[in-house]
C-alpha cells in the first residue's frame, strides 16, 4: 500500500499539462499600432516664452486677437450650449492681479479664479437664445469703454461654474502684451 501511495504522489508531482487548443505565440501583436516617433527637436528650434510685456487673459490668450467672425462663432457656441453669457470690463490698471485689484486670501494668484473682479456690463444674459443680442451688447460695451479690457464669460447654471471666458477687446493703448509672433525668443 505504501508503494502505491508513493508511486501516486510521484506521478502527481510529474503531472503533464492537459492538452489545450491554445498555443503559445512567439510574439504577441499589439492591439494598437504605435504612433510614429517625431524627430527630436534641435536645441536651436526650442523657444523660450518671454515674461516681459506678455500678459495673458483666460481661454484664447495664446492666440492672436479674435476677429469679429471668430467672436461671433464663440457666441453661437455659448448660446447653442445653453450657457449664460455675461460681459465684464476693467480699466487697464485694474485688469491684472495686484494688491489694489484683488482680494487675497493667500500669497498666490492662479489667474483663473484669482479674486480679481471686473465690473459687469448690465446683468448676465439669462435665457438668451439670440446670438445677435450678445453681439449687440459687445458693441455697446466697447463703444462705452473704448480704453478698457472687455471680456465675455459664459456660465453653466447647472454645474454652477464659469465655463469659458475670453477677451473681446484689448485697449488700443495697451502695451502689456506681445503679438503672437513675438511672444517667444
UniProtKB/Swiss-Prot annotation:
Q: Which UniProt keywords apply?
A: Calvin cycle, Carbon dioxide fixation, Chloroplast, Methylation, Photorespiration, Photosynthesis, Plastid, Transit peptide
Which domain of life, per UniProt? Answer: Eukaryota
Principal cellular location given in the protein's record: plastid
From its record, what is one biological process in GO terms? reductive pentose-phosphate cycle
An example molecular function term from Gene Ontology annotations? ribulose-bisphosphate carboxylase activity
Tell me a GO cellular component: chloroplast
**Which residues get modified to N-methylmethionine?**
46
Q: Where in the cell is it found?
A: Plastid, Chloroplast
- Which SUPFAM superfamilies is this protein grouped with? RuBisCO, small subunit
Presence of the UniProt keyword Chloroplast in the record: yes
User: What functional role does this protein have?
Assistant: RuBisCO catalyzes two reactions: the carboxylation of D-ribulose 1,5-bisphosphate, the primary event in carbon dioxide fixation, as well as the oxidative fragmentation of the pentose substrate. Both reactions occur simultaneously and in competition at the same active site. Although the small subunit is not catalytic it is essential for maximal activity.
Miscellaneous comment as given in the Swiss-Prot or TrEMBL entry: The basic functional RuBisCO is composed of a large chain homodimer in a 'head-to-tail' conformation. In form I RuBisCO this homodimer is arranged in a barrel-like tetramer with the small subunits forming a tetrameric 'cap' on each end of the 'barrel'.
What the record says about family reads: Belongs to the RuBisCO small chain family.
Oligomer and partners: Heterohexadecamer of 8 large and 8 small subunits.
HAMAP family documented for this protein? RuBisCO_S_bact
Name it: Ribulose bisphosphate carboxylase small subunit, chloroplastic 1
> Gene name?
RBCS1
